[in-house]
Amino acid sequence: MVQLFDFLQQYSDYFIIGLLLLMSIIMLAMVIERYLFLRKVSVAHYSTIHALDIDLNRNMTVISTIGANAPYVGLLGTVIGILLTFYQIGHGGGDIDPSVIMLHLSLALKATALGILVAIPSMVFYNGLGRKVEVNRLKWKVLSEQKDKE
């Protein structure tokens, strides 16, 4: 058990922060791809709204999933940090310095803050892109109604 705590103490921050960094890079790549696609898509080239929906909504789930799960990844880092703090308190003998405990707990909370920092832009981008998807769907419906009237 001691080896597990030593491993967590050495590598948990790297793992959690690395995972959040990876999530943010993936999210940004998907946002850029979606933005560029939605900016140039021509709804007139689609014969059905279902085909349009498939193209409009591609990668949107990834952006939403990252936004929804990043706080949980950060929370996992915080829980591990608090667990390690309690482990160190338990193995510290009888001397417990409150300032050291507070320092460790505050450092443990950085993972949650980073998770929220990834989640907020993800959800903002998701909602903004979702609006562009809806506008393109409405454009297709208007064109479809105009074709039906002709």
Curated annotation (Swiss-Prot):
Biological process per Gene Ontology, one example term: transmembrane transport
Result of altering residue 144 to N: In strain: TN106
GO-annotated cellular components: plasma membrane
Entries under Pfam families matching the protein: MotA_ExbB
Name listed for the protein in its UniProt record: Biopolymer transport protein ExbB
Subcellular location: Cell inner membrane
Residue intervals passing through the bilayer: 12-32, 66-86, 105-125
Family recorded in the similarity comment: Belongs to the ExbB/TolQ family.
Assembly behavior: The accessory proteins ExbB and ExbD seem to form a complex with TonB.
Keywords: Cell inner membrane, Cell membrane, Membrane, Protein transport, Transmembrane, Transmembrane helix, Transport
Membrane topology: Multi-pass membrane protein
Origin superkingdom: Bacteria
InterPro entries recorded: ExbB/TolQ_transport (IPR050790), MotA_ExbB_proton_chnl (IPR002898), TonB_ExbB_2 (IPR014172)
The UniProt record lists the keyword Transmembrane helix: yes
Function noted in UniProt: Involved in the TonB-dependent energy-dependent transport of various receptor-bound substrates. Protects ExbD from proteolytic degradation and functionally stabilizes TonB.
